[in-house]
Swiss-Prot record:
One of its GO terms (biological process) is regulation of apoptotic process. This is Tumor necrosis factor, alpha-induced protein 8-like protein 2 A. Keywords: Immunity, Innate immunity. Acts as a negative regulator of innate and adaptive immunity by maintaining immune homeostasis. Negative regulator of Toll-like receptor and T-cell receptor function. Prevents hyperresponsiveness of the immune system and maintains immune homeostasis. Inhibits jun/ap1 and NF-kappa-B activation. Promotes Fas-induced apoptosis. The gene is tnfaip8l2a. Pfam families: DUF758. The lineage of its organism: Eukaryota, Metazoa, Chordata, Craniata, Vertebrata. Belongs to the TNFAIP8 family. TNFAIP8L2 subfamily. It comes from Danio rerio. GO terms for cellular component: cytoplasm. The central region was initially thought to constitute a DED (death effector) domain. However, 3D-structure data reveal a previously uncharacterized fold that is different from the predicted fold of a DED (death effector) domain. It consists of a large, hydrophobic central cavity that is poised for cofactor binding.
Amino acid sequence: MEAFSSKDMAMQAQKKILSRMASKSVAQMFIDDNSSEVLDELYRVSKEHSGNRAEAQKVVKNMIKIAVKVGVLFRHEKFSAEELSIAQEFRKKLHHGAMTAISFQEVEFTFDKSVMINLLSDCRDLLLKLVEKHLTPKSLDRIRHVFNHYSNPELLTHLYDPQGNLWSNLSKICSGLNRMIEEGKL
């Protein structure tokens, strides 16, 4: 006989509903203005680099879905002590990645795409390890899609070109990341 849990059912419903509603208006309920601005700039970077509006929207939508689902899992205290340790490691790696991204933008001639690719890959792997027991294979593919998209060497080279057309977007992204770090959100 299966054990019934209304709490588990409510969490599943929340994850399902929120994943279907990952639009900009719903994102604003869960994501502050600063984060929203960073997401908007990441969308513009993806759209400009790929020339594909639909793909850029899909990447950002996947990012929002992932953030919401991980937030729901935290809210419902679904992570074990071991997983919470992985979450801490992920948070530290993400913070380190943000600091590195900012440093590469602020200090000329320091950009090293292999460093950024490795940081993004490490973040992806930690996040996958954190949620692998909680999310569907489709959600895990969304995580891979987002991190693989932004760790594309051509995109990173294009983004970090001071003479390139994405430099102003990078400046805004780094500005937003700086604010998140100052506010203790990243």
